C-alpha cells in the first residue's frame, strides 16, 4: 500500500482554464475527492482571450477549453500536445457522429476531446419586452440590429457580447451575408449596421448578463444558450416574477462545440488526462449539463440528466432549428485582425 500512498500524494494538481459559468456545481470538489488531484481553476469569457494566452506560448495551464473554429489554427500553431487515448478509459462514451464533425478542425481527433455544445441567440425578459416592443416572443435578430427596436429597448437595458467572433457573424448572417465571409466589404457592412445601434447598447460583456437578466437589470441580451438558461433558473429561484426566455432567431444563430485540450507547456499531463477522463463519465457530464444548461456529447448521459432539461429545446434544439444554425469556420488571420479592428470601432462608437 505504500507505493499507492506516494502515488496519491504525487497526484498533485491540475491547472484548468475554462469558460465562466461552465462547470457543474460540485464537479471540481467531486473530482478531487475521487482522484486526490487538486484542481486550480481560472475562467475567461471569449475565444480571443484564450487564444492570446495560447499563442504567447506560456499558459501555465494543463487543460483549456477552446471552441471548434479556433481549434484548427491553434493546433497548426503547435499550441497543444496530442491526447493520449490510452489514458482515457471513458473515451468510448463519446458520440461518434460528433467526433466526426470535429475532425474538420482536428483531423483524427488527435488534440481535442469534446466537452459541451450550444448555440448563440437572444435571452430576454418576456414581460419587459412585451411592454416595450408589444411582442409576446422574440423571433428575429432585428430586435438587436435595427435602430427602431433598440431605441425602445434602451430604456430597459440591452447587452451585447464583447467579442468580434460572437457578434460579427451574427450580424452578417442576419443581413443575408456569409457568416464566415472573408470579404472585407461584408465586415464593413456589419460594422455600419452595428454603429447605428451602438448608442442604445447598455454594455458589452460576455458573462455579466446572466445575473443582470436574472435580476431584471437588463431586458435583452445577445448570449450563449446555457448562460440564458442559467439566468432563467436564477430568476425562478429568486421568485421575484422575472420571466426569462431564450430564442434562436429565425435567421439562425451560431452552433458551436467547445473542446478540452492540453497546452504544449502543461507540466501535469497525467493529471490533465485524469480530469478529461473524469468529465467523460456519463454521470459526471450529466450533472454538468443539468447545472449549466449546455448539451453534452455523451449519449450515455441522456437518461441520467434531469429530463426537463434534456427535453428543453433551448438546451437540445430540435433538428428543424439546428438546420437554421451556422457553424463558424476557421478564418484566415488577416480576416480575424480585420474583425478585431472593426469590433474596436463598434465598441468605441467611432
Say what each PLM segment does:
Residues 123-128, 172-176, 256-268, 287:
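A bilobed periplasmic-binding-protein/Venus flytrap-type ligand-binding module shared by bacterial periplasmic
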Residues 258, 263-324:
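Mature extracytoplasmic/periplasmic domains
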Amino acid at each position: 500500500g505504500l507505493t499507492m500512498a506516494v502515488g496519491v500524494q504525487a497526484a498533485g494538481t491540475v491547472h484548468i482554464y475554462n469558460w465562466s459559468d461552465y462547470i457543474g456545481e460540485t464537479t471540481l470538489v467531486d473530482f478531487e475527492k475521487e482522484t486526490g488531484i487538486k484542481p486550480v481553476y481560472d475562467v475567461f469569457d471569449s475565444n480571443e482571450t484564450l487564444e492570446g494566452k495560447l499563442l504567447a506560448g506560456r499558459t501555465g495551464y494543463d487543460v483549456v477549453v477552446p471552441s471548434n473554429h479556433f481549434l484548427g489554427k491553434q493546433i497548426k500553431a503547435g499550441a497543444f500536445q496530442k491526447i493520449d487515448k490510452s489514458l482515457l478509459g471513458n473515451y468510448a462514451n463519446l458520440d461518434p457522429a460528433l467526433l466526426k464533425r470535429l475532425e474538420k478542425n482536428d483531423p483524427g481527433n488527435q488534440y481535442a476531446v469534446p466537452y459541451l455544445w450550444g448555440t448563440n441567440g437572444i435571452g430576454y425578459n418576456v414581460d419587459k419586452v412585451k411592454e416595450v416592443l408589444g411582442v409576446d416572443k422574440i423571433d428575429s435578430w432585428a430586435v438587436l440590429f435595427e435602430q427602431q427596436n433598440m431605441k425602445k429597448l434602451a430604456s430597459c437595458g440591452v447587452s451585447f457580447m464583447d467579442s468580434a467572433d460572437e457578434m460579427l457573424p451574427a450580424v452578417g448572417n442576419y443581413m443575408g451575408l456569409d457568416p464566415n465571409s472573408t470579404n472585407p466589404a461584408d465586415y464593413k457592412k456589419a460594422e455600419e449596421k452595428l454603429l447605428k445601434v451602438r448608442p442604445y447598447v447598455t454594455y458589452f460583456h460576455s458573462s455579466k448578463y446572466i445575473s443582470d437578466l436574472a435580476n431584471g437589470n437588463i431586458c435583452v441580451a445577445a448570449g450563449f444558450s446555457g448562460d440564458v438558461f442559467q439566468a432563467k433558473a436564477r430568476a425562478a429561484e429568486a421568485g421575484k416574477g422575472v420571466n426569462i426566455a431564450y430564442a434562436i432567431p429565425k435567421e439562425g444563430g451560431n452552433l458551436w462545440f467547445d473542446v478540452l485540450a492540453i497546452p504544449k507547456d502543461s507540466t501535469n499531463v497525467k493529471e490533465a488526462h485524469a480530469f478529461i477522463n473524469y468529465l467523460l463519465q456519463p454521470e459526471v457530464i450529466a450533472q454538468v449539463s443539468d447545472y449549466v444548461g449546455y448539451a453534452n456529447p455523451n449519449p450515455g448521459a441522456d437518461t441520467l440528466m434531469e429530463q426537463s432539461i434534456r427535453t428543453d429545446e433551448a438546451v437540445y434544439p430540435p433538428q428543424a432549428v439546428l438546420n437554421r444554425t451556422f457553424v463558424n469556420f476557421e478564418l484566415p488571420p488577416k480576416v480575424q485582425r480585420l474583425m478585431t479592428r472593426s469590433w474596436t470601432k463598434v465598441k468605441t462608437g467611432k
